[in-house]
Amino acid sequence: MYHQLILMALIGVIMANVVPFSMSNIPEEYKEFIPEEVKNFYKNLTQEDRQILRELASKHATFANEDAALEALKNTSDKLYQKAVELRNFVKAKIDSLKPDAKAFVDEIIAKVRSLRPEDGQKLDMEKLKQAARDIIAKYEALNEETREELKATFPNTTKIITNEKFKRIANSFLQKN
C-alpha cells in the first residue's frame, strides 16, 4: 500500500505541474486518479485559457521560480491567475500544515518531480519517472509510522484512491522494470 501512496502523490504532483492543458488528452483509465482540485482547475478552462497555459509552459525554463511564472500568468490573464493561485494556495496550505519530517518528505517529492520536467520540445522520460517513483517509495518506507499516518490524514483523498484495486494494478504495472 505504501508504494501506491507514493506513486499517487507523485502522479498528483505531476498532473499539477506537467499534465496536458486538456483533460481529454489523459487516458480514461487514469482520469479517476487525478486529484479533484486539479480536475476543477481544468474543468472550466476556455480555449484562450488553454492557449495561454501552453504558451507559458513552453517558456517554463525562463522562469526563475513558481512566483515568476505566476506573475507572467497574471500579466496575461488575471482570471486564470486567480484560479492558479487558488489551486496553489490549497496545496501549499496542506503542505504547510505538516510537521517537519512529513513536510520535508513532500518538499523532496516536489523537487524531484520538478527535476523530471522535460526540456522544451522533449517528452517526459518514463524511465526517469519510474526511477524517481522507486526512489520516493524507498524514502517513504524509511519514514516512521507517525509521519506516514500524518501524510495519510493530510491527504485523505490519496488514501481513498490508493485502496482502489484498479489503481493498485495500474501502479504495479507502471513500476515494473523493463
From Swiss-Prot:
<comment type="similarity">
    <text>Belongs to the fatty-acid and retinol-binding protein (FARBP) family.</text>
</comment>
<feature type="glycosylation site" description="N-linked (GlcNAc...) asparagine">
    <location>
        <position position="44"/>
    </location>
</feature>
<feature type="glycosylation site" description="N-linked (GlcNAc...) asparagine">
    <location>
        <position position="157"/>
    </location>
</feature>
<feature type="signal peptide">
    <location>
        <begin position="1"/>
        <end position="16"/>
    </location>
</feature>
<dbReference type="InterPro" id="IPR008632">
    <property type="entry name" value="Gp-FAR-1"/>
</dbReference>
<keyword id="KW-0446">Lipid-binding</keyword>
<comment type="function">
    <text>Binds retinol and different fatty acids.</text>
</comment>
<feature type="coiled-coil region">
    <location>
        <begin position="122"/>
        <end position="154"/>
    </location>
</feature>
<keyword id="KW-0732">Signal</keyword>
<keyword id="KW-0845">Vitamin A</keyword>
<protein>
    <recommendedName>
        <fullName>Fatty-acid and retinol-binding protein 1</fullName>
    </recommendedName>
</protein>
<keyword id="KW-0175">Coiled coil</keyword>
<feature type="glycosylation site" description="N-linked (GlcNAc...) asparagine">
    <location>
        <position position="75"/>
    </location>
</feature>
<keyword id="KW-0325">Glycoprotein</keyword>
<dbReference type="GO" id="GO:0005576">
    <property type="term" value="C:extracellular region"/>
</dbReference>
<dbReference type="Pfam" id="PF05823">
    <property type="entry name" value="Gp-FAR-1"/>
</dbReference>
<feature type="coiled-coil region">
    <location>
        <begin position="67"/>
        <end position="89"/>
    </location>
</feature>
<dbReference type="GO" id="GO:0005504">
    <property type="term" value="F:fatty acid binding"/>
</dbReference>
<dbReference type="GO" id="GO:0019841">
    <property type="term" value="F:retinol binding"/>
</dbReference>
<keyword id="KW-0964">Secreted</keyword>
<dbReference type="GO" id="GO:0016918">
    <property type="term" value="F:retinal binding"/>
</dbReference>
<keyword id="KW-0683">Retinol-binding</keyword>
